[in-house]
């Protein structure tokens, strides 16, 4: 496929030029500087090109980075993560990303800046290698993402999917809620794909959720077994074996069972987006989709989209981005109506296997929680944004996935 425009996020560029400016000292909130090796402007966090000292030098000096209007859940999740009392302990926070709303900090450089919580040394001294989000380099993430890309043998082939992407609009038009595409997005999908074990296990999960937040999720024994079956099937694939091998080598997990248990908690563990206890999870939000305050949130999966469109529940309106890949998986950023509720921009892989998406989102959440994660797929750069759910935790203070989605590409 060919790109019609860039996603509103700019192309992520690795500006590592020798001899260029590499610090934000006296540069906070300046305009983009093409002569600098890294940036200190308000949008560098979204572009993934901030200097290493940006968060420590600049985040106290300006207001929140301006939200990206086409991805409404970004601001929603960012606000949700701050709707709790700022903690004064490092319990469950060792080597988390810097958050200016916290009274004290537990990140890798808090000792350097003298703003650590009092229990930082006692709680975090043994966690630096295994829990620091900076322990896995950008180059390592890009390398493993290429391996995962090559390992996805369950993906759709060119002849398995016929798309009719139709009208490409500008980002300024995404809020208009105008249906510019008279025909469905999917002209044809070879449904034999859905008989593959991971696809079948994935599809079994999609009807286990109530899409409206504020209504508690209550799983039957069969539905809980379906979660285990999905994890069991994807762990048989080369995609997930590549991911586990990488994370095991990075000392993130000591055994495959520990890895699977953590995946189950971070993705399927319930938390509360609305008034009802346990009304949401990372899996429901990202893959199945939710409705909150009259808007579609999450819903970043092509299989779910196809099945709902086939039933007449999804009406495809337009797209603002069509990725550069000439085979599957590809990427599409689209506007649609889901049974009466509008999605301003929903980015999604097209034609990927369930394990492929699950692996990449998990990789980014583990390696870059709450940040932009820069990948490489078939030689093309791609970025994924994750958010942590900070209002509740599991295990020894671990955080659930709030959301994960594609934010940029070339």
From Swiss-Prot:
List, alphabetically, the Pfam families matched: Somatomedin_B, XendoU
What is the required cofactor set for this protein? Answer: Mn(2+)
Domain (EndoU) ranges: 137-410
Disulfide bonds listed in the record: 24-28, 24-40, 28-58, 38-40, 38-51, 44-50, 51-58, 90-94, 90-106, 94-124, 104-106, 104-117, 110-116, 117-124
Its tissue distribution reads: Placental-specific, but also associated with various malignant neoplasms.
GO biological process terms, alphabetically, are:
female pregnancy; immune response; negative regulation of lipid catabolic process; post-transcriptional gene silencing; proteolysis
Q: Which segment of the chain is annotated as a signal peptide?
A: 1-18
Record's keyword annotation contains 4Fe-4S: no
Query: SMART domains annotated for this entry?
Result: SO (SM00201)
Q: Give the primary localization class.
A: secreted
Does the record carry Metal-binding as a key word?
yes
Which family does the record claim for this protein?
Belongs to the ENDOU family.
The record, for PANTHER family, names: PLACENTAL PROTEIN 11-RELATED (PTHR12439), URIDYLATE-SPECIFIC ENDORIBONUCLEASE (PTHR12439:SF40)
- Name the record gives this protein: Uridylate-specific endoribonuclease
Species this protein is from:
Homo sapiens
């Amino acid at each position: 496929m060919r790109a019609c425009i860039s996603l509103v996020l700019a192309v992520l560029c690795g500006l590592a030029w020798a001899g260029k400016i590499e610090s934000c000292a006296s540069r906070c909130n300046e305009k983009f500087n093409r002569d600098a090796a890294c940036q200190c402007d308000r949008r560098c966090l979204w572009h993934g090109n901030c200097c290493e000292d940006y968060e420590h030098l600049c985040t106290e000096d300006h207001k929140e980075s301006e939200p990206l209007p086409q991805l409404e859940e970004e601001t929603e999740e960012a606000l949700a993560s701050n709707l709790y009392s700022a903690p004064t302990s490092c319990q469950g926070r060792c080597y988390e990303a810097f958050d200016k709303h916290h009274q004290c900090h537990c990140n890798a450089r808090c000792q350097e800046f003298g703003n650590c919580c009092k229990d930082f040394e006692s709680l975090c001294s043994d966690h630096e290698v295994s829990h620091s989000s900076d322990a896995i380099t950008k180059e390592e993430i890009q390398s493993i993402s290429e391996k995962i890309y090559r390992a996805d043998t369950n993906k759709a082939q060119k002849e398995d999917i016929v798309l009719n992407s139709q009208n490409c609009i500008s980002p300024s038009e995404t809020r208009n809620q105008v249906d510019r595409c008279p025909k469905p997005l999917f002209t044809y999908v070879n449904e034999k794909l859905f008989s593959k074990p991971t696809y079948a296990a994935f599809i079994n999960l999609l009807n286990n959720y109530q899409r409206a937040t504020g209504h508690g999720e209550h799983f039957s024994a069969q539905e809980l077994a379906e979660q285990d079956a999905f994890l069991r099937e994807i762990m048989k694939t080369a995609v997930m074996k590549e991911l586990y091998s990488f994370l095991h080598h990075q000392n993130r997990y000591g055994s495959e069972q520990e890895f699977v248990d953590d995946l189950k908690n971070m993705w399927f563990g319930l938390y509360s987006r609305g008034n009802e206890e346990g009304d949401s999870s990372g899996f429901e939000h990202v893959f199945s989709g939710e409705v909150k305050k009259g808007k579609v949130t999450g819903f970043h999966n092509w299989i779910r989209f196809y099945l709902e469109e086939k039933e007449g529940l999804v009406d495809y309106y337009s797209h603002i981005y069509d990725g550069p890949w000439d085979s599957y998986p590809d990427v599409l950023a689209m506007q649609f109506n889901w049974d009466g509720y509008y999605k301003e921009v929903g980015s999604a892989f097209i034609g990927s296997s369930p394990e492929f998406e699950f692996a990449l989102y998990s990789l980014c959440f583990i390696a870059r929680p709450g940040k932009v994660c820069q990948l490489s797929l078939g030689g093309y750069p791609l970025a994924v944004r994750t958010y942590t759910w900070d209002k509740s935790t599991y295990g020894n203070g671990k955080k659930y996935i709030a959301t994960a989605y594609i934010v940029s590409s070339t």
